[in-house]
């Protein structure tokens, strides 16, 4: 960042220092962090103990097989797994037929984190495929000819912004997209996920994300949305899907990220939210759980850890003197160790936890969380912590949109040159990039 009074998310590539401290999870005393159920077993405690036992086996095996334990990100194996998936999927993915733009996004974002270029012919094929997924009524469906839905719309726009070419940007019909968002807007400020569908915080985030990236925010599009999201924060401190529901990592990320885009972070009790999310990092495993009393899951390496840069920036803007200017407010080393020791499939790809299968969803969000844990701040305040070998370093990701920071700047710069559909001159303040404010 430029100065201590201007905290940004942009982390340019740098020569990242490798953390040389002993592995946190392999300390002899670390076993004391395991669950103590005081001899009162519940279904929850039994399942937690099973997971901890599997993870203890991983830690012990790693320590036994490495005279000098060194964490290694299996970049080549992950690359080949992702490369194959972009061209052809097995019939096991038939259940995700309505999530095909998501598959494009998960794979493309994973590749950009690994700093693997996307061949032009592949980029063109993705653009042409996503164009087939775009509805004549605006927005994108889960596949060609399917009804539009905000979730695949978010995924498609992110994928196209990652490609970042004129061809990719031109796929997006901004006029129809704006009409589609208006068709989903509810009187209380919330959004439907699709016409006739459910309302929850995901839809508000997806709408705010695609609207801000493509410069289609109008003065009234998000009227009442920040207030509705604030009502979703519950007594725990996190955010539920709708007002009155249990706090959940995915919904909490969506809620806070949407408010960052709308410049309304102060609508929330930020200190309460901070306490909730930092309590979700597991003491023994090092990864994050999605809710209180749930199991660790690699995907929350992003959904939960990604909240901490957003909270750091919001609290910094309020002048909080207790904030570190070198570390996020979670155990970055422990999270990296969990991902690198427990979430890598030997054949490539990443997973939820030991014993689970790899998939593109967990590959994307484990790598995204690993990137968050490696990079803090930018410019003069840049502070990297890369566990293991130097080659483990990933490209940074923007914690609001979860694509490369430079891709956010490139897309917003491109679309800001175009007028908001229906407005000859519209310079609404929320169309600026949260990365550079």
Curated annotation (Swiss-Prot):
A GO cellular-component term linked to this record: protein farnesyltransferase complex
Cofactor(s) needed: Zn(2+)
Domain of life: Eukaryota
Protein residues bound to (2E,6E)-farnesyl diphosphate: 248-251, 291-294, 300-303
Cofactor note: Binds 1 zinc ion per subunit.
Translocase found in the keyword field: no
Swiss-Prot/TrEMBL PFTB repeat ranges: 123-164, 174-215, 222-263, 270-312, 332-374
Keywords: Lipid metabolism, Metal-binding, Phosphoprotein, Prenyltransferase, Repeat, Transferase, Zinc
GO MF annotations, alphabetized: geranylgeranyl diphosphate synthase activity; protein farnesyltransferase activity; zinc ion binding
Catalyses which reaction(s): L-cysteinyl-[protein] + (2E,6E)-farnesyl diphosphate = S-(2E,6E)-farnesyl-L-cysteinyl-[protein] + diphosphate
Signal peptide: none
InterPro entries: FTB (IPR026872), PGGT1B-like (IPR045089), Prenyltrans (IPR001330), Terpenoid_cyclase/PrenylTrfase (IPR008930)
Pfam family, one: Prenyltrans
SUPFAM superfamilies linked to this entry: Terpenoid cyclases/Protein prenyltransferases (SSF48239)
Modified positions (Phosphoserine) in chain numbering: 432
Chain positions with Phosphothreonine modification: 436
Assembly behavior: Heterodimer of FNTA and FNTB.
Function: Essential subunit of the farnesyltransferase complex. Catalyzes the transfer of a farnesyl moiety from farnesyl diphosphate to a cysteine at the fourth position from the C-terminus of several proteins having the C-terminal sequence Cys-aliphatic-aliphatic-X.
Descriptive protein name: Protein farnesyltransferase subunit beta
Annotated source species: Mus musculus (Mouse)
